[in-house]
Regions:
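Alpha-helical membrane segments and immediately flanking helix-loop junctions
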Residues: 73-151, 273-328
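Short amphipathic alpha-helical coupling elements at transmembrane boundaries
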Residues: 32-40, 67-72, 233, 261-272
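Signature of multi-pass transmembrane helix bundles
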Residues: 1-50, 107-115, 120-251, 255, ...
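Transmembrane alpha-helix/helix-exit interface in multi-pass inner-membrane proteins
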Residues: 52, 56, 249, 253-266
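Transmembrane alpha-helix boundary signature
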Residues: 53-61, 94-101, 158-161, 219-224
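Interfacial/capping segments of alpha-helical transmembrane domains
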Residues: 58-76
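Interfacial helix-start motif at the membrane-water boundary
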Residues: 46-53, 81-83
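Alpha-helical multipass membrane-protein architecture
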Residues: 30-33, 38, 42, 61-62, ...
Length: 335
């Protein structure tokens, strides 16, 4: 049995455990996580379905511009999609733009989970939740975290068994963008922060337009935006993810509890207080609580946690569930 299939079996066992705990009154808190996993389909659908339906249109419109630019350095146009999170349109857009399937998987599942998630989720959401006086620590942590993205992309690609030359060439645009973002955070931090917030709002507008147009077309048969994929294509993906998350959240709760002591010990050795050490563990499931905890962390903990969330956000949570739903064979490289 491959590791990917092993993970799916673990998630399946999580479904049974969570379901039983829900039946018997949520005695261990796993029944609640069972519900939480299934209920996450709503937010996921809001963030994903619109861009899934628009992906063919975006690829058709931007393709003539993007393809020649990326071909100049020998990179696959799919790498353009890494500016979006994997579960917020990065994956479907990458696969639409991809000239090589492996490059599409590298971009849409591995790199987008780090770079795209940072651009469209971690920065705008984090800035909205952390205290204003913590922004310098947040920026410093992002600066450190961004440097890990090319390394993570290369390692993930090699674990997936992709051709090393293909991986390295396609990392060139990622390295360039990571360096530009890092330089921006050093020299023009306010402009970078404002730009990230504006970009995040723009993505929400695009996603909403796609969702509304696709829903209208489904209900009436009237096409507003020609070339869109049917809304059901996106909803099928969401359903697949929801089934996996039924088991992911209960299992994740058990994993986080098991890892809590060793990771807390590591955190304390790195010089963080208890809150900072706890943030390292929680990020693996969901980074949103960590932003709210930052006000109680010491300065070192704030920087380390922000750097950690760039490659690690939801690695054992939504990103694991999403990958298992769309490409189970890519679970190991993504994680």
């Amino acid at each position: 049995m491959s590791f990917d299939k092993f993970i799916i079996w673990i998630m399946a066992i999580g479904v049974i455990i969570g379901g039983l705990d829900r039946i018997f009154g949520n005695r261990f808190g796993l029944g609640e996580k069972f519900e939480e996993g299934f209920n996450s389909m709503g937010p996921l659908a809001l963030g994903m379905v619109g861009i899934v339906t628009l992906a063919p249109v975006i690829a058709k419109v931007l393709g003539p511009v993007i393809i020649p630019i990326f071909n100049l350095v020998g990179a696959d146009p799919a790498m353009f999609a890494t500016i979006l999170a994997n579960d917020m349109g990065g994956y479907p857009l990458a696969m639409e733009l991809a000239q090589n399937e492996e490059a599409g998987l590298l971009a849409g599942l591995i790199v987008a989970a780090m770079l795209g998630c940072t651009i469209v989720f971690s920065i705008p959401v984090g800035l909205g939740l952390i205290e204003y006086e913590d922004r310098p620590f947040f920026a410093k942590g992002l600066l450190a975290g961004l440097t890990t993205i090319p390394v993570g992309g290369i390692i993930g690609g090699l674990i997936a068994g992709f051709d090393i030359k293909m991986v390295l060439i396609n990392m060139i645009p990622v390295i360039v963008l990571s360096v530009l973002l890092a330089l921006g955070l050093v020299y023009i931090p306010k402009m970078m922060i404002n730009g990230a917030l504006i970009f995040g709002k723009f993505i929400v507008v695009v996603i909403t337009v796609g969702l509304a147009a696709a829903a209208f077309e489904e209900l009436t048969g009237v096409v507003i935006i020609p070339g869109m994929a049917p809304i059901m294509d996106g909803l099928v993906i969401i359903g697949q993810i929801g089934v996996v998350l039924l088991g992911t959240f209960p299992i994740l709760t058990l994993i986080v509890k098991a890892l809590e002591k060793p990771l807390n010990a590591v955190g304390q050795k790195l010089g963080m207080n208890a809150t900072g050490a706890a943030g390292i563990v929680i990020t693996l499931a969901n980074s949103i609580p960590v932003y709210k905890m930052m006000k109680d962390m010491d300065p070192k903990g704030k920087v380390i946690n922000t750097a950690w969330l760039v490659p690690a956000t939801a690695a054992l949570g939504d990103h694991l569930g999403f990958t298992a739903g769309v490409r189970p064979d890519m679970i190991t490289p993504v994680v």
